[in-house]
Structure formats: C-alpha cells, structure tokens
C-alpha cells in the first residue's frame, strides 16, 4: 500500500503547480506568436514558388471600365478568390504603353495574395506626375467604386504602387507624396527629377543594365542614392536586360516584386530571406547588381 506523507504531498503539490505554471507560460507565449502577424497569407515561401508563373492563390478578374473610372483610364483588377482581406496594389504602364504590358504582373502578384489593378492611363503619352495622380485615383477606385467582391477583400491600411518607365517615375512621385503607402516598386523608372530624399516608403527600384531609354546611371541609380538610408530600400539591376524587360514575363522581376510586397505590405518576415542578403550577382546571374539597406 502506498502512503503519502505530508512531505511527499507538499512535493507533489509543488510539482503540479510548476507544471501548471509552465503550461500557462507556453500558452501565453504561443498566443502572441500566432497573433503576431495577422496579415500573413499563404504557405512558407520557397525560391521555386516565387519563380513560378503563378502563386498559391487562384485569381479572378474584374474590369474597371474607362467610363466608370474617375481620374484614370480604367483597367483590370486581379484578386484572390479566397475570402480574406489583402493588401492592394496599383500598377501603371510606361510611356505609350497600355495595361496589357503589365497584365502579367497584375495576375502574378494577385496569385500571391494581393488585390491588384493594372491601369490604363488617360492617354498613353501622360507624363510621370500625371501617372502618380492616376495611380492614386486607381487605389481610391478599388476602395470605393469596385464591386463588393473587390472592396470586401481590401485592407485599406495596406496599399502600394508600382509602375514601368514613366509609370515608375509616377510611382516615385506618389511615394514622395503619400508616406502612408506600405511599398513602392519603380521598374526601369524614368523621371526628370533625380532627387527623392523625402521618400520614406519602402522602395525597391529595378533597373536594367542595357537600358538606353532610362539609363541606370542617370535614372535608377541616382533615384536610389537620393532616397535616405533611413528608408528601407533596395536596388536590383537586371543583367543583359533592356528598358522593356518589365513588359514580358520575367521571373526575377516577379520574384523580387512579390518578396518586397510580402515583406512590407504584409509585414511577412518569412520573405526577408530573399531580400537580405539578396540575389546572387555576376555574369552567370540574372542580376547584375544588388544593394540595399538590409537588415529589414
């Protein structure tokens, strides 16, 4: 027969209290970890997932007609079919371009858990600052005038912009005017203004080494250098690529654009691994140069 002495009883009680306290501490620690990032969407990322033509989310489309668009030329909205809330991104084409030149980016980014509008501009000759206003109008449209299927999926506190060429210049301009944006990605950007020292929005600039329309030496690099080092920023220069690299499917542009948006729009640190220290560079790489203000 087992007899519990007062001393043994006290020991068992102490042990039970310790176990209960440890369990409570584990629960207390686990809960914040699970709730630390309510914006995290999708599976753990891999390089092959980001290089693929589409991500883990199925995508639907909605047309924004030119007649119904206020302040821009209409476009196409791409959004995940899964009911949830997502960050929203507006993308502008470049000089003489239309939404068709950036449609691949819209669908690709949406498939990673974003609502994206690829816009047409009012005229294909619109200058960068006009494109900035139109990107802003497109964000407003998604929040107020799009269908409920789109509006109900957008987290209005998490907005970003992208653009090619003069659309990239417009992206820089809007980023300088709207510090509440979560991210900006100018693609082979063009703008007469070379100084963007007032930008605080996390900015990824993608240039191309063979660009003769917006040479990196007089556009992308000065733009990047002028943004304060206190701002989260990165410069990626494509290897053996021209000004029009963003107009066709490009796995490097797709991968690092998604990683940047995930990191700063979704605050998803799972994607930091792709940005810091960043891609391999050199003759055998798709990236000629990469620099940043890591760590992010």
Curated annotation (Swiss-Prot):
Disulfide bonds join 276-294. Changing residue 249 to P: Increases thermostability and activity on pNP-butyrate. The lineage of its organism: Bacteria, Bacillati, Actinomycetota, Actinomycetes, Streptosporangiales. Its main location: secreted. This is Cutinase est1. It is found in: Secreted; Periplasm. Poly(ethylene terephthalate) binds at residues 95, 166, 190. It catalyses: (ethylene terephthalate)(n) + H2O = (ethylene terephthalate)(n-1) + 4-[(2-hydroxyethoxy)carbonyl]benzoate + H(+); a butanoate ester + H2O = an aliphatic alcohol + butanoate + H(+); cutin + H2O = cutin monomers. Has potential for application in biological recycling of plastic waste products. It comes from Thermobifida alba. Belongs to the AB hydrolase superfamily. One of its GO terms (cellular component) is periplasmic space. Residues 1-35 form the signal peptide. Induction: Expression is not induced by the synthetic polyester poly(butylene succinate-co-adipate) (PBSA). The keyword Secreted applies. Optimum temperature is 50 degrees Celsius.
